[in-house]
């Protein structure tokens, strides 16, 4: 995995700091609001299990990972669900087409590369798929999750950061979170 600078987080999505990847930051209008783990994690896990089965039926060779804050025990979150769908790079476009049959559309105003496509739920559920080419730099979604899962102190610091951003704009929140994410991903 490439470790060029890491930055912004949008709907739980970590993006690289280099200029083309900054486009992956979405534009959201409302101020930040967060929920304690016991207020959202069980429902996100149930929703993840539902989509995991549906994705596996469409893409039996895909790796399917619950990522984002809702996948980290005891983490404060916006209550959204992010799912990484890892596929062979040559099959990414076909995977995107198949996943769209589950009611997902390609996310506009965000990064789109041959190795990454972000899909959002079109029915109003706060669920996103990150369709990622296996072996690409975009597998860092899983790395960030795993680092926090292994370190309760990092989760506590992440929670404190998020709570301190309550009422902030999404832009301000992403800036503050970017520095934290960059530090976490830079740790050995």
UniProtKB/Swiss-Prot annotation:
Disulfide bridge partners, by residue number: none
Gene3D superfamilies linked to this entry: Beta Polymerase, domain 2 (3.30.460.10)
One Pfam family hit: GrpB
SUPFAM superfamilies linked: Nucleotidyltransferase (SSF81301)
Superkingdom: Bacteria
Protein family according to the UniProt entry: Belongs to the UPF0157 (GrpB) family.
NCBIfam families listed in its UniProt record: super_attC_Vc_1 (NF041952)
Record's protein name: UPF0157 protein VC_A0354
């Amino acid at each position: 995995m490439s470790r060029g600078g890491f930055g912004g987080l949008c709907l739980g999505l970590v993006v690289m700091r280099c200029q083309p990847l900054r486009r992956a930051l979405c534009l959201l209008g409302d101020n930040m609001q967060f929920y304690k783990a016991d207020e959202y994690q069980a429902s996100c896990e149930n929703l993840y299990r539902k989509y995991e089965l549906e994705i596996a039926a469409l893409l039996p060779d895909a790796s399917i990972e619950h990522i984002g804050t809702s996948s980290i025990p005891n983490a404060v979150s916006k209550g959204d669900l992010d799912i990484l769908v890892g596929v062979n790079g040559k099959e990414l476009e076909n995977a995107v087409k198949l996943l769209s049959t589950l009611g997902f559309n390609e996310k506009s105003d965000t990064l789109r590369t041959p190795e990454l496509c972000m899909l959002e739920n079109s029915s109003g559920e706060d669920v996103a798929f990150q369709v990622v080419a296996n072996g690409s730099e975009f597998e860092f979604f899983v790395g960030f999750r795993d680092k926090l899962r292994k370190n309760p102190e990092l989760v506590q610091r992440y929670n404190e950061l998020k709570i301190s951003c309550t009422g902030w704009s999404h832009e301000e929140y992403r800036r503050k979170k970017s520095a934290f994410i960059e530090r976490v991903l830079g740790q050995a």
